[in-house]
């Protein structure tokens, strides 16, 4: 039996050999992007401001350039900062950067299944089917427009019922936007007081809040250990199972009344495809159906409702902007009909305001992580297969080369000298490349129709002085959150 001293020598020698081999392989293949030196296991955790990771990454980009490496715990991440680096990776080398990176909170639920959190051939097949099915059910067409307007009508009635009293608009918007995606996925809407519906919203909100919390950030870095430890993460693990069980039951209900010749909703279309492809290698199976449906709910609920909620705050802070939107609504739509999506072509100022709300809010500045699917050379650096990549979309939204005063809320960022809408290459709120948000068409339609319908019926009122409005999103780890507030919807 080896004594302790000899055993220690053997271990140190083995580690030294492994390190030398790793360094030799790196030298042969090429060099990794530069970055701060990580500590064992905890990586660069102590060098990051965990309350505002985006600011820390901005500071690191000033030192290391637009492509650099950080370690979030034991996980190596390559960061892409600025328009040029992001475009070169996600567009010019789209295939190599098409994998889905690690997001521990959501991976606890999705585990690599479903359209949003899968990679490789699975992601390609599910994405093709999802885009085609959403298109079949009217996304970007009149069919979904009618569903949005129907839901907008219910929202207006709810807001009228507040009689101008100050309210937090969060739950009102969440119910409305979630019901739009529900009508597409399930083929029906929920009553706003339906306990099943409220439970679904509560569980999704719980996961989103945990992911943005300090504990959620630690879990993202050290989930391999924390999943075995007591703490809030254990409750989230239970929530993920409840969400999966909820969606399994919804699929079962659809399956029991399925007519293969007449699909009623997204679930029906997926079930029919499952029946058509029964070979063992098909990606069209129950697990992917359940997780794709959940993916659509997460993507289709939070983003639009949060953007609108932040938009209300910005319009109250800038009443001159709200007044111009009211004026354009009066000129183009009037008071005697509902808005239509085709109206946005005649309403450049309103569309510029919506774009500027998205840009200024910058609620997910780090974007959604990508993953390198094969050994890749990028800007002279070697990126091994399996490396996670953060395309920092927030760096595009605040680039003074594209937005002269990025810290100011200014719809003129999207208007030319004639007051017409202009494109801005750095405005990529739905990302770009092969993994851009497949619900971007739906989100754009919702933002325009819901905002114009609300402003056609109400003026916004803040219960305190305008100077008391805090319009700056609050940094929270990997994300930014909207300040809590109340407001009044004053009937016109």
Curated annotation (Swiss-Prot):
Catalytic activity: an organic molecule + reduced [NADPH--hemoprotein reductase] + O2 = an alcohol + oxidized [NADPH--hemoprotein reductase] + H2O + H(+)
Enzyme class, spelled out: oxidoreductase
Compartment list: Endoplasmic reticulum membrane; Microsome membrane
Positions carrying Phosphoserine: 130
Pfam family, one: p450
A molecular function (GO) term: oxidoreductase activity, acting on paired donors, with incorporation or reduction of molecular oxygen, reduced flavin or flavoprotein as one donor, and incorporation of one atom of oxygen
PROSITE patterns per UniProt: CYTOCHROME_P450 (PS00086)
Family as reported in the entry's similarity comment: Belongs to the cytochrome P450 family.
PANTHER family associated with the record: CYTOCHROME P450 508A4-RELATED (PTHR24300), CYTOCHROME P450-RELATED (PTHR24300:SF103)
Protein name: Cytochrome P450 2A1
Organism of origin: Rattus norvegicus (Rat)
């Amino acid at each position: 039996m080896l004594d302790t001293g000899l055993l220690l020598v053997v271990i140190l020698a083995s580690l030294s050999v492994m390190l030398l081999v790793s360094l030799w392989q790196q030298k042969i293949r090429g060099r990794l992007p530069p970055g701060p030196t990580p500590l064992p296991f905890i990586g660069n955790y102590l060098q990051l401001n965990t309350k505002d990771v985006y600011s820390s990454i901005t500071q690191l980009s000033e030192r290391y350039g637009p492509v650099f490496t950080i370690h979030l715990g034991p996980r190596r991440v390559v960061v892409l900062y600025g328009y040029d680096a992001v475009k070169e990776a996600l567009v010019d080398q789209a295939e190599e950067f098409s994998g889905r990176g690690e997001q521990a909170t959501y991976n606890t639920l999705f585990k690599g299944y479903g359209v949003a959190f899968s990679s490789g051939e699975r992601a390609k097949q599910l994405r093709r089917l999802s885009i085609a099915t959403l298109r079949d059910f009217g996304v970007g067409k009149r069919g979904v427009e009618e569903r949005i307007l129907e839901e907008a009508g219910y929202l207006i009635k709810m807001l009228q019922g507040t009689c101008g009293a100050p309210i937090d608009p969060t739950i009102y918007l969440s119910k409305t936007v979630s019901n739009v995606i529900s009508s597409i996925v399930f083929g029906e809407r929920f009553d706003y007081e339906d306990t099943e519906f409220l439970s679904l919203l509560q569980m999704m909100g719980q996961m989103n809040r945990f992911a943005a919390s300090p504990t959620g950030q630690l879990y993202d870095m050290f989930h391999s250990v924390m999943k075995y430890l007591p703490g809030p993460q254990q409750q989230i693990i239970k929530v993920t199972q409840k969400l999966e069980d909820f969606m399994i039951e919804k699929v079962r209900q659809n399956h029991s009344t399925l007519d293969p010749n007449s699909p009623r909703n997204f679930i029906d279309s997926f079930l029919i495809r499952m029946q058509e492809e029964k070979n063992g290698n098909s990606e069209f199976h129950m697990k992917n159906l359940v997780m794709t449906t959940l993916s659509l709910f997460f993507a289709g609920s939070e983003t639009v409702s949060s953007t609108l909620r932040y938009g209300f705050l910005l319009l109250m802070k800038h009443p001159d902007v709200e007044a111009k939107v009211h004026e354009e609504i009066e000129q183009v739509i009037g008071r005697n009909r509902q808005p239509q999506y085709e109206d946005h072509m005649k309403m450049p100022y309103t569309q510029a305001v919506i774009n500027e709300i998205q840009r200024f809010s910058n609620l997910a500045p780090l974007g959604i992580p990508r993953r390198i699917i094969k050994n890749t050379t990028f800007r002279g650096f070697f990126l091994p297969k399996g490396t996670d990549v953060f395309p920092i979309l927030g760096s595009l939204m605040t680039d003074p080369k594209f937005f002269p005063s990025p810290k100011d809320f200014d719809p003129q960022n999207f208007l030319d000298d004639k007051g017409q809408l202009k494109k801005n290459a750095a405005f990529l709120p739905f990302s770009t490349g092969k993994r851009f948000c497949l619900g971007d068409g739906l989100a754009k339609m919702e933002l325009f129709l819901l905002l114009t319908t609300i402003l056609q019926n109400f003026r916004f009122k803040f219960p305190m002085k305008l100077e008391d409005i805090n319009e700056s999103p609050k940094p929270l780890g990997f994300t930014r959150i909207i300040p809590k507030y109340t407001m009044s919807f004053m009937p016109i």
